């Protein structure tokens, strides 16, 4: 896989994380980009030759003036889930979602998932599992330094 924005990410010692299913023709991820000093959410699509095209910043309300990280697009219900410090939060990174259109690259108003999903600590990487009616996310809400736990809800 080609690196995206290698100069910008190297400057911050950051490596984007991708979460997508095999065979998908797109991927969403957070990255430092050429237009912003903060982490923003991008989409990258595969072309007809099965090569990754240039990433595009997600348009609309998702990206703020602070960091957005760990995005996941649920194509079954059209929601883009992500964590942010830049929208109205309970503290740290909170979990958010926005209706997102792959066709127009446009996101709608951002919705905080609130407690019990978001907490005063860092909560991130919300991944729904519609087939089983649950979701997973990670958090350091237990208060232990550098201790991250995953939750099934």
Which residues fall in each region the model found?
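Short, conserved micro-motifs composed of acidic
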Residues: 1-153
């Amino acid at each position: 896989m080609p690196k995206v924005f290698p100069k910008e990410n190297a400057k911050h010692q950051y490596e984007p994380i991708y979460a997508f299913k095999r065979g998908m023709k797109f991927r969403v991820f957070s990255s430092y980009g050429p237009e912003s000093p903060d982490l923003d959410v991008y989409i990258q699509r595969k072309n007809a030759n099965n090569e990754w095209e240039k990433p595009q910043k997600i348009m609309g309300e998702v990206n703020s003036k602070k960091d957005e990280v760990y995005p996941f697009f649920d194509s079954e219900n059209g929601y883009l889930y992500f964590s942010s410090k830049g929208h109205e939060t309970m503290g740290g990174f909170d979990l958010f979602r926005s209706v997102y259109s792959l066709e127009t690259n446009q996101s709608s108003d951002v919705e905080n998932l609130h407690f019990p999903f978001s907490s005063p600590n860092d909560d991130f990487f919300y991944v729904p599992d519609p087939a089983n009616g649950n979701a997973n996310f990670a958090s350091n809400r237990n208060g232990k330094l550098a201790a991250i736990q995953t939750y099934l809800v």
